[in-house]
Amino acid sequence: MRFKLIFFLFTLFSFNSYLCQENDNLILNPSFESIDGKLRKLNQINVANDWYSPTSLKADLFSSSVPGDIGTPENIYGKEFPKEGENYAGILTYSYNNKKPRTYLQSMLIKPLASGLNYCLNIHVSLSDLSKYAIDNIGIHFSEEPVTLDKKGDIIFNDKAKLSAVVTNEKNKIYKSRYKWETVCGVYQADGKEKYITIGNFFNNKDTEYEKLTKSDDFPGIQSPNAYYYIDNVELIL
C-alpha cells in the first residue's frame, strides 16, 4: 500500500513538473508555426499569429509549405532547416553604410513580467548564406507599450533607460554560423509591467561590431552588404 502511494505521488509530481515545463515559456507562437492567412511573399511576418513588425518595413516569414523565395530550407537569402517545426522568421540587422533599413520582430507576452524577478531569454539565430557581414548586438527589448516607428528605418536607443531594457548575449559575440543555429542567451531583471518584446539590433552601426565574411560555396548567388539572420524558437522563462 505504501509503495502504491509513493508511486502515485511520484507520478503526480512528474506530471505536474511536465505541465510546468510546457507552460513556462512566456512567448506566444515561439517557433512561428501557427499562421493565419496565405503566405505568398517576403515581408509577411504578420501571417504568423501573434507576431508583427514595429516599422513599416516588415520582417519575413519562411515556411516549408511555400517553395521559392520564402521556402525552407532553401530561400532567397540562403539555406537553413528550421530549428523546430516547419517555419522560421528573418530580419535584417545591419547594412553597410546604412544602405538598407533594418527589420524587427515584435510580440505581446503571455502575461506581464513580475517586478524584481529574473527571466532567462533564448533566441536561436542563423546567419543567411548571402550575408556579407556578421554582427553582435542581436537582442530583445522589453517594454510596457509596443515600440513603433511609422516609416522604414532603424530603431536606435540612445538613452540609458531604453538600453537597460535590451538584453543581448552576456559575451555579446559576433554570430557568424551558417547552417547551424546559435543561441542568443541572456538574463533580464524585470521592473514589472513589461508586456511586449521586440527582437533586432537597437544600436547604431558605429557601436555594432561586425566581421566581413567570404561567400560560402554551398549556396549560389551574390552576397549582399548586410547581416540577415533567420530567427526561430524564441523562449522566455523564469
Predicted segments with their positions:
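Solvent-exposed strand-to-loop "edge" motifs in beta-rich extracellular domains
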Residues: I110, H124-L130, Q189
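Bacterial Sec-dependent N-terminal signal peptides
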Residues: M1-I27
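Short helix-capping and hinge/turn segments at secondary-structure transitions, especially at repeat
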Residues: F15, S128-D129, I231
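A short tyrosine-centered beta-strand micro-motif
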Residues: N118-I123
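Aromatic (Trp/Tyr/Phe) and Gly/Pro-enriched flexible surface segments
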Residues: Q21-M108, P112-A114, I138, K152-L238
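Extended, low-complexity, turn-rich repeat/linker tracts enriched in Gly/Pro/Ser/Thr and Asp/Glu
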Residues: S126-A134, P146-T148
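Conserved positions within compact, well-structured domain cores
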Residues: D136-E144
